[in-house]
Amino acid sequence: MKRLILAAAILATACQPATTTTAAPPAAPAAAEMPPVTIYHIEGRRSERIVWLMEELGLPYELKFTRGNIGESMAAIRAVNPGMPVAPTVTIGDQVLTESGAIIETIINRYAPGKLTPPLESADYANHMIWMHHAEGSLASRVIADYRVWMIKPPTARSPLVDSEAEVQFAEDYLATHPWFGGAEFSAADIMMVFPLNFAMQLNIVDKNQFPSINAWKAKIEQRPAYQAMLAKARPDGIPGSPPALPQHAPSGPRPAPALPAAQPAQPAQPAKPAQQ
């Protein structure tokens, strides 16, 4: 009888549905203690991104530039970073950093882990990372190159290659279905994308009226208190020495198909040479 009871208990246990537990996502690592941060800045340059980042995070920093004097601001940068005098040049303790995207990721990962970044396991994280790097790797490089060429020779037709309008349209299409470049929430990717999109639109590289989703996104950006604080501190008098807008941008419309190289005619086969005796 005892054996029958034991067998029934084992059978009942085996027939119970299996339960699974979902592990909670790992907690963000603790923030490291932040040494003094100094941002060497020139008005209207990418160093604005770092000022804006620090305002969003509520972290302390020192901002160094000579108001309205690009030459003196650059001299201060050269004194700290003679090998690569660019804005931004940022010192964190005794370390000198350049490249705004790298500076942003370093500050967030060390001193504000989990902030302005979607959760690692989310779908938004991959999109956030794409736009973090697309801002300079694809968008800025394209619009700046087109600006320089078109200032010398205004365009009369769309390029068959990926041109500035195609780059900006790519961002427009994404924002048509997402509120921010970070996906559902504002992220550091939005900080990265403002500079090249402003450059493209304010300098008439593209027709700004063609991109309603970008314009709506920019309006939200401009209402953020941290962005307004950045403008007041980093651009109090506008942008000295701002480049002129293009007299005309490329016509709108589809890009022409790239021309394929002409096929080369087949060469007639050469008769085999007789073997040498």
Question: Which residue ranges define each predicted feature?
Answer:
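Sec-dependent signal peptide recognition
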Residues: 2-7
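C-terminal motif of bacterial Sec signal peptides marking the signal peptidase cleavage site
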Residues: 12-14
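Bacterial signal peptide processing site
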Residues: 16-18
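Compositionally biased, proline/threonine/alanine/serine-rich low-complexity intrinsically disordered stretches
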Residues: 21-32, 255-277
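GST-like domain detector, emphasizing the conserved glutathione-binding G-site
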Residues: 22-158
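Residue-level signal for nonpolar/aromatic packing positions in well-ordered secondary structure
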Residues: 39, 54, 90, 171, ...
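GST-like fold's C-terminal all-alpha helical module
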Residues: 132-223
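Acidic/histidine-enriched, glycine/proline-rich intrinsically disordered or flexible terminal extensions
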Residues: 234-261
